[in-house]
């Protein structure tokens, strides 16, 4: 019977150029008799039979690869059988000329069916020296099907060294797709654009166009996104493309490395474990930090209203009720040193605690993080900065410096950055909260530079200058944290110095604001501690100093510190 099967195999191969249907019948006759005839299963694959059972049988009998063909002295490459290994990345096939190739096709099929663990188990048993890149590629296919994007990147990050330049190009697509799904849109755009020019560009054109469109839309480049979507709708129409064309707010559903790592079942994207205790902790920390702030009564009240409105909106939405959708972006105005950055951290904790943003992340930035030196580069630089803040809060201190006045001329680089920021604030409004901060008059000037900017901010919080008494209270807190204490005389000297600055104007602003308010209090405490230490260092027997004397900042220490700090700040009379 073995001779008969070999003869049937030889006949089936010879019929391939003339009648694939007849060849398929002969290959099927062989497998009906002997399910372990691996070569015949591959013949069926060559004839278009890529059923899951066929792929499984070919893989299950892979140890018999080459037996039938060898018995009639036919090379398996003669069949020209190819198997799909592209997964969601592209229409990629691979020649079935080895047991490893069979395993690759089987793994791709199982991953598409959701049998990720089986696919990975088959690949783990398959490594062949010199073919590690093939296994790495297939693992990226399996991980991609399971939406384990961080693992995809791990598998393809060394693809530049792969000997197969086609698969190396496809790996660039996989890297770009993973980056897009992790909301790293600038990186996704770079990877996908490079991959489009690689040998795999044509085979992966569909995936490249879709994810590049989603990346560009999220970056505010709607016209480029629409152009790609229209090409897809013409060449590869499908419901999601039509939906994205119809609705400009259509976005890629992204995730984070933390969410992937928190899955109860690593292969199930829906098994992300929500730890509400963590959210409750964030809310408690936010409230505690808010309570610790000295003064800021109006600010605290506004933050409480912001928190209440956000909470109730989520409660109403959960019950299917209509919810107003005011912008969550905020403006903080006031002089330096009045707690704006601290309150921004409080807001980040509140929003993360309420589940509005993914994590209590505050990315602190200024003009240098947005504005480049060459035309066209500010948009790229701004996009990268915004990508870092996705899922959290982007805090822009001295935001008025984004667009600078140049002898009455516009600042093209700053305007480019601002336009990009404005688009992303709208496009990423569900994943990004922007807080801009600075002096009230300067922020108003910034808002006038773009018609749509003011409307992006629904909440504006004014930070008042601290009173001298509040600054003294802050100074006492700072000192206590350093195991120091102000004597009554030191406190009085501090208070009088602060009152003098409160009454003075310097460079068109209140001197206390120029000094930095809370920062001024910290500078005086730190300088007075240095003066105290210098004084105590003159004691003949240092070992006799008790804790009270080591802790005490006296009137002369504070007076000397005031003179030094005022000189440094150029505030002397």
Swiss-Prot record:
> What does the record say about the knockout?
Disruption abolishes EsxA and EsxB secretion, but not their expression. It results in a lack of antigen specific immunogenicity and leads to attenuated virulence.
Specify the signal sequence span: none
Superkingdom, according to UniProt?
Bacteria
Q: Quote the CDD domains the UniProt record gives.
A: AAA (cd00009)
List, alphabetically, the SMART domains matched: AAA
Broad class of the protein's primary localization: cytoplasm
GO cellular-component terms in the record? cytoplasm; plasma membrane
Q: One MF term in GO for this entry? A: ATP binding
Query: Family assignment?
Result: Belongs to the CbxX/CfxQ family.
Q: Fill in the subunit field for this protein.
A: Part of the ESX-1 / type VII secretion system (T7SS), which is composed of cytosolic and membrane components. Homohexamer. Interacts with Ppe68, EspF and the C-terminus of EspC.
| Protein name (Swiss-Prot/TrEMBL) | ESX-1 secretion system protein EccA1
Question: What species is this protein from?
Answer: Mycobacterium tuberculosis (strain ATCC 25618 / H37Rv)
Q: What is the lineage of its organism?
A: Bacteria, Bacillati, Actinomycetota, Actinomycetes, Mycobacteriales
Q: What gene is this protein translated from?
A: eccA1
């Amino acid at each position: 019977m073995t001779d008969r099967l070999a003869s049937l195999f030889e006949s089936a191969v010879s019929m391939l150029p003339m009648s694939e249907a007849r060849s398929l019948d002969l290959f099927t006759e062989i497998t009906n008799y002997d399910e372990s005839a691996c070569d015949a299963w591959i013949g069926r694959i060559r004839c278009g039979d890529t059923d899951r059972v066929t792929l499984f049988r070919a893989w299950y009998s892979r140890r018999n690869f080459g037996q039938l063909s060898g018995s009639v002295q036919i090379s398996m490459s003669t069949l020209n059988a190819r198997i799909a290994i592209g997964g969601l990345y592209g229409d990629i096939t691979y020649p079935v000329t080895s047991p490893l190739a069979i395993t690759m096709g089987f793994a791709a099929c199982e991953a598409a069916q959701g049998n990720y663990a089986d696919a990975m188990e088959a690949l783990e048993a398959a490594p062949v020296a010199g073919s590690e890149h093939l296994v790495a590629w297939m693992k990226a296919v399996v991980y991609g099907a399971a939406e384990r994007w961080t693992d995809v990147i791990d598998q393809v990050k060394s693809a530049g060294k792969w000997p197969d330049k086609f698969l190396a190009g496809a790996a660039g697509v996989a890297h770009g797709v993973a980056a897009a799904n992790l909301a790293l849109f600038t990186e996704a755009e770079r990877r996908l654009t490079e991959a489009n020019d690689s040998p795999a560009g044509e085979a992966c054109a569909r995936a490249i166009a879709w994810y590049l469109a989603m990346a560009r839309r999220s970056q505010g480049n709607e016209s480029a996104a629409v152009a790609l979507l229209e090409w897809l709708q013409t060449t590869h129409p499908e419901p999601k493309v039509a939906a994205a064309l119809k609705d400009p707010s259509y976005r890629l559903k992204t995730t984070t490395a933390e969410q992937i790592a928190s899955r109860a079942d690593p292969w199930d994207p829906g098994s992300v474990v929500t730890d509400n205790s963590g959210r409750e902790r964030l809310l408690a920390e936010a409230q505690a930090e808010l309570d610790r702030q000295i003064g800021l009564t109006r600010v605290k009240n506004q933050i409480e209203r912001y928190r209440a409105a956000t909470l109730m909106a989520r409660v109403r939405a959960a019950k299917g009720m209509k919810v107003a959708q005011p912008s969550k972006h905020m403006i903080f105005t006031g002089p330096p040193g009045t707690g704006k950055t601290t309150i921004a951290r409080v807001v980040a904790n509140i929003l993360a605690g309420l589940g509005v943003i993914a994590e209590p992340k505050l990315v602190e930035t200024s003009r240098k993080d947005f504005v480049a030196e060459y035309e066209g580069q500010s948009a790229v630089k701004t996009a990268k900065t915004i990508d870092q803040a996705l899922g959290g809060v982007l805090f822009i201190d001295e935001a008025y410096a984004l667009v600078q006045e140049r002898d009455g001329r516009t600042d093209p680089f700053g305007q480019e950055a601002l336009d990009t920021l404005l688009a992303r604030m709208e496009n990423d409004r569900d994943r990004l909260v922007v807080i801009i901060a600075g002096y009230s008059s300067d922020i108003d000037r910034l808002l006038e530079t773009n018609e749509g900017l003011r409307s992006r901010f629904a909440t504006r919080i004014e930070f008042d200058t601290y009173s001298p008494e509040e600054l003294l209270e802050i100074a006492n807190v700072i000192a206590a944290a350093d195991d120091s204490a102000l004597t009554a005389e030191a406190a009085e000297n501090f208070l009088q110095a602060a009152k003098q600055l409160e009454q003075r104007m310097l460079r068109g602003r209140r001197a206390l604001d120029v000094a930095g308010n809370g920062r001024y209090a910290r500078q005086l405490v730190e300088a007075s501690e240095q003066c105290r230490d210098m004084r105590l260092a003159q004691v003949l027997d240092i070992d006799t100093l008790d804790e009270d004397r080591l802790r005490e900042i006296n009137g002369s220490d504070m007076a000397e510190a005031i003179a030094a700090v005022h000189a440094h700040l150029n505030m002397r009379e």
